Amino acid sequence: EWETSVLDSLNRLEYYKETQWQECNEQTADRFSAVAFAFGQMLSDSLQVPIGLILNAVGGSPTEAWIDRKTLEFDFPDILTNWLQNDFIQDWVRQRAFLNIKKSSNKLQRHPYEPCYLYEAGIRPLKQFPIKGIIWYQGESNAHNMEGHEKLFRLLTESWRNNWQEELPFYYVQLSSIDRPSWTWFRNSQRKLMDIIPNSGMAVSSDKGDSLDVHPRYKREIGERLARWALNKTYQQNIIPSGPLFRTVTFKNGAAYVTFDYGAGMHTSDNNPIRTFEIAEYDGLFTPAQAEIIDNQTIKVSNK
């Protein structure tokens, strides 16, 4: 439960403390995002220029909190209605917010998880700065509603691009491999968004996740994967931005042939045959399948 003084400041949009640019050193980096630090360090080392990073992430916050009100009113008005009882918003988000504002007698009490709040408190004030691009590592609080997130994430990028540039680079992290059944489908949904949102890129994190912890300890690798997207797409560096990403599948002689972007030279990390592929026929039932790499960038999958 938050104190009255904190609740009052939230109603004045005074959630973030005033700050200033700080040089990166052992003390300032200790309080900063490890993923963002690794991202910035790789960019600075590669480009040989200083990189300025602004961190205003809020743990557990849902995507809708970061979108401007006009956009939500026009494109997703239902999510604005009575948000603490709104089923569009994840149960945990609403429960945490309700607990935080329990001491408030203000029927219009605001909270950082409220739709639009973090945009108003943390994004709109940055409009005066020439932002070069965005890295985004949130989404857990929207994983309960894959279809809703697909729409909200598109609205998020449009909302922020209205502040800066039409195709502001937007690089995001795919959710990791914690043991939650719905996250597999959510990760695939995030992958598809790359083909919908222009000038975007996705860093895979499932191989660096933790089955029990939503905050896995492998930060540097994730930050550097984001940096590869920025170096390739924003700074036009000759660097492969990603590991293999699904592109097409064709069917021939009882087998599926899967092609990938960034798949040249594809091989397994232990040089053993590919494992864990499954295939389904018309009945929709998946069974273990044989998979092999052919021509270094295509995988043949069959149940023979």
Region locations from a protein language model:
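Cell-envelope and extracellular/periplasmic
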Residues: 1-304
